[in-house]
Amino acid sequence: MEYYSAIKNNDIMKFLSKWMGVEEIIPKAGKEPDVLQQTMDTENVVYLHNGLLLSYNDFMKFIGKWMELEYIILSEFCEERASYTKLKRGVWKRSAPEDFLDKRPNKKILIGNEELTRLWNLCPDNMEACKLETREYMPILEEFFEEAIEQADAENMVESEYKAINNSNYGWSTLRFLAWRSPHFFQPTNQQFKNMTEYLENMVIKLAKELPPHSEEIKTGEDEDEEDNDALLKENESPDVRQDKPITGERIESLTNKLDEQWKILAPYLEIKDSDIRQIECYSEDMKKRAKQLLVAWKDQEGVHETTDNLIGALNKSGLSDLAESLTNDTETNSYLLSLLFY
């Protein structure tokens, strides 16, 4: 500390002799006054660790006086007085899921299993994915009550004991579904029902009057087949779907020759780990071999889910847009040639 470097100063020694005597600083020492100078030179290390010279009480007194003396020296001889700051306690914060997510360029999480990794990364934001319409598993009102409406029709001649509304499990599911989908559930009524079956039968009759006829909403098998065929034709014509194909060995060879020394720029965007990158560097000094090894490692990591579209996206994100454009053109050319063969 600063006051130790100034201990040998004559002004401080004069101050010490005025403030307290030698006997008070070193009780029972029985030595000459130059002991004080020697003690200060060694920062009291020798004297404080000598148990023969001090008893416990004298030692505690010495420590107390020495601490007081240190404060006075600091306040009198230092240019700036010592300032003390309060210790700030760390604020406890609840861990959020985002704290554990991988901060990689495209935020892809590697679960450790190929299928789990694919399922987890179907959507970048899982909370937003839960709001998608495709995640809505509750059936449509018409589909849910289709069976009950058919059984309620007198022309079908279904006996009451065989109707679905008599099933207690179906009844409770129907009540929950009506509370979610139908406005009739919360409308007041003057009718009184003895049991749940009578209430559900009344609700089914109301819905049968409001919903469209069954023939209008159900399509024939021929119409469905025609729509499936049209969808297949559109799928074959779509360039986006054509790009969503596994990468062949020829494309890897072509991309390897173009990638060359830029393979290390692309590696982080293909979610290649640092340990794998170091292993690729040790594999060979040839840049083309390293680039090929990178693409092979990426194919092994993605498994059956590696596609040309994913590779093009990684190339664009890494700034290698010229290679991405070249790969896109090659893909479109191959798709065009295949279409000529089939037509």
Curated annotation (Swiss-Prot):
Q: Which residues form the DUF1725 domain?
A: 13-31, 60-79
Q: Which GO terms describe its molecular function?
A: DNA binding; RNA binding
Q: Which residue ranges are recorded for the region named Disordered?
A: 211-244
Q: Where is this cross-link: Glycyl lysine isopeptide (Lys-Gly) (interchain with G-Cter in SUMO2)?
A: 86, 258, 273
Q: Which family does it belong to?
A: Belongs to the THOC1 family.
PANTHER family linked to this entry: THO COMPLEX SUBUNIT 1
Q: What is this protein called?
A: THO complex subunit 1
UniProt organism field: Rattus norvegicus
Taxonomy, top ranks, is: Eukaryota, Metazoa, Chordata, Craniata, Vertebrata
Gene encoding this chain? Thoc1
